[in-house]
């Protein structure tokens, strides 16, 4: 009796406006993966398509084109924290389901408003905290050396996103400049994606697992189902959504998933980290001298834009 070959799953790290890296990575994936496996693959983009790099607009054009170019693939586009903030600036986030206003998200962090230079232009009254931070202008430079980042301009390094659409940083003209197809893409991004049967090579051999893909990760000490519900419901009443923005709190695998054969795959952290079933695929972090990486399952092979595959 023939066993069915496991489906190829490709998880792509944070792109951050780097269209040239994305083009090269995609070509390398096509070159390295058997054609039949590539053409039917599940491709999960782990979020953060915008900011830092110069070509956010072209990156989103590329992503939008994939379903037509590769109709037998399945494409999943996770929202990263940068994309969340971008969408909020454009007025695309769902309203808080508890009936509160977005201004309620400002209160806990109001002492940082002047220091971080939150956006105060047209429409700010109805923006989520993260969107005001995204479009603002920092009064001073912040050295987040733990993340290898020296922020200039917006705390999100968002100036390049504005400029890719032909408008200056912090301008409300961005709302009109972003095409409707891009707004639809940003609206439809999912905050979490689950698969019930994904194969991965482990010390025990080929193992069938569940998979949860979320931009930053799941809080290791909080109830998993409550977190998944928040993400499925797109709860925008929260100022900082840890599964999209967290660092140490979402680095590992939640304790309750330890013995449940569940892969948790993320980007966000500016590192490539593979520890059992915890996969963090963000080797590049959006910076010029670092690669854009993807992981291919079940083999766990890492493919980068910098790889040179001979034909």
Curated annotation (Swiss-Prot):
<dbReference type="GO" id="GO:0046872">
    <property type="term" value="F:metal ion binding"/>
</dbReference>
<feature type="binding site">
    <location>
        <position position="81"/>
    </location>
    <ligand>
        <name>a divalent metal cation 2</name>
    </ligand>
</feature>
<dbReference type="GO" id="GO:0004725">
    <property type="term" value="F:protein tyrosine phosphatase activity"/>
</dbReference>
<comment type="function">
    <text>Protein phosphatase that dephosphorylates specifically tyrosine-phosphorylated peptides; especially active on dual-phosphorylated substrates containing a phosphothreonine-X-phosphotyrosine motif.</text>
</comment>
<feature type="binding site">
    <location>
        <position position="16"/>
    </location>
    <ligand>
        <name>a divalent metal cation 1</name>
    </ligand>
</feature>
<feature type="binding site">
    <location>
        <position position="240"/>
    </location>
    <ligand>
        <name>substrate</name>
    </ligand>
</feature>
<feature type="binding site">
    <location>
        <position position="247"/>
    </location>
    <ligand>
        <name>substrate</name>
    </ligand>
</feature>
<keyword id="KW-0963">Cytoplasm</keyword>
<feature type="binding site">
    <location>
        <position position="14"/>
    </location>
    <ligand>
        <name>a divalent metal cation 1</name>
    </ligand>
</feature>
<comment type="similarity">
    <text>Belongs to the PPP phosphatase family.</text>
</comment>
<feature type="binding site">
    <location>
        <position position="52"/>
    </location>
    <ligand>
        <name>substrate</name>
    </ligand>
</feature>
<feature type="binding site">
    <location>
        <position position="48"/>
    </location>
    <ligand>
        <name>a divalent metal cation 2</name>
    </ligand>
</feature>
<dbReference type="InterPro" id="IPR041768">
    <property type="entry name" value="RLPH"/>
</dbReference>
<feature type="binding site">
    <location>
        <position position="268"/>
    </location>
    <ligand>
        <name>a divalent metal cation 2</name>
    </ligand>
</feature>
<keyword id="KW-0904">Protein phosphatase</keyword>
<keyword id="KW-0479">Metal-binding</keyword>
<feature type="binding site">
    <location>
        <position position="16"/>
    </location>
    <ligand>
        <name>substrate</name>
    </ligand>
</feature>
<feature type="binding site">
    <location>
        <position position="133"/>
    </location>
    <ligand>
        <name>substrate</name>
    </ligand>
</feature>
<feature type="active site" description="Proton donor">
    <location>
        <position position="82"/>
    </location>
</feature>
<feature type="binding site">
    <location>
        <position position="48"/>
    </location>
    <ligand>
        <name>a divalent metal cation 1</name>
    </ligand>
</feature>
<dbReference type="InterPro" id="IPR004843">
    <property type="entry name" value="Calcineurin-like_PHP_ApaH"/>
</dbReference>
<dbReference type="Pfam" id="PF00149">
    <property type="entry name" value="Metallophos"/>
</dbReference>
<dbReference type="GO" id="GO:0005829">
    <property type="term" value="C:cytosol"/>
</dbReference>
<keyword id="KW-0378">Hydrolase</keyword>
<protein>
    <recommendedName>
        <fullName>Tyrosine-protein phosphatase At3g09960</fullName>
        <ecNumber>3.1.3.48</ecNumber>
    </recommendedName>
</protein>
<feature type="binding site">
    <location>
        <position position="215"/>
    </location>
    <ligand>
        <name>a divalent metal cation 2</name>
    </ligand>
</feature>
<dbReference type="InterPro" id="IPR029052">
    <property type="entry name" value="Metallo-depent_PP-like"/>
</dbReference>
